[in-house]
Amino acid sequence: MKQLFLIIGAPGSGKTTDAELIAKNNSEKIAHFSTGDLLRAESAKKTERGLLIEKFTSQGELVPLEIVVETILSAIKSSDKGIILIDGYPRSVEQMQALDKELSAQNEVVLKSVIEVEVSENTAKERVLGRSRGADDNEMVFHNRMRVFLDPLGEIQNFYKNKKVYKAINGERSIEEIVHEMQEYILSFGN
């Protein structure tokens, strides 16, 4: 049975980098997928689905639910690793419910934890506007992305707290400290 860890956090919280480093440090047993990377890869293919994804992401809006869930489940199932880290998911209550429904209907993957990398809005803004990764990283789009992240956050936190799988990690520290704490936590579940 594959162990799934969802890593959430504001834009600029470092969730993708944290997950990448943990997967790299434990490459024999941990695979990492960034929802953003999966969607960007699909978008770059310029397929019908890719163009649809691009239309939403270029405006900082959420990609339609069925496209995101399909993309994520396909990544989990195709992996040969026992521990899967996915960052940037869920971003909405609907995404959370859709994944929960899919996970409940099968017995190949079990959700072990949802880890939130917590940072202040100021820290997130400094990091995002300072890195200019792509066309979406300007101030107006940042505020839109922040709103999209914050609006459903309380409900997402409560849902996973009630399932006893929620964990918050302080993202205002050095990357080494954050990665160390998160990696120890993930590995504490064993195989």
From Swiss-Prot:
Name listed for the protein in its UniProt record: Adenylate kinase
Catalytic activities: AMP + ATP = 2 ADP
Signal sequence extent: none
Family that this chain belongs to: Belongs to the adenylate kinase family.
Stored Pfam families: ADK (PF00406)
Residues annotated for AMP binding in this entry: 35, 40, 61-63, 88-91, 95, 133, 145
Quaternary structure, from the entry: Monomer.
GO CC terms of this entry: cytoplasm
EC number: 2.7.4.3
PROSITE patterns in the cross-refs: ADENYLATE_KINASE
Compartments where found: Cytoplasm
Lineage summary: Bacteria, Pseudomonadati, Campylobacterota, Epsilonproteobacteria, Campylobacterales
GO biological process: AMP salvage
GO molecular function: adenylate kinase activity; ATP binding
Chain sites annotated for binding ATP: 12-17, 131, 173
Residue ranges of the region described as NMP: 34-63
CDD domains: ADK (cd01428)
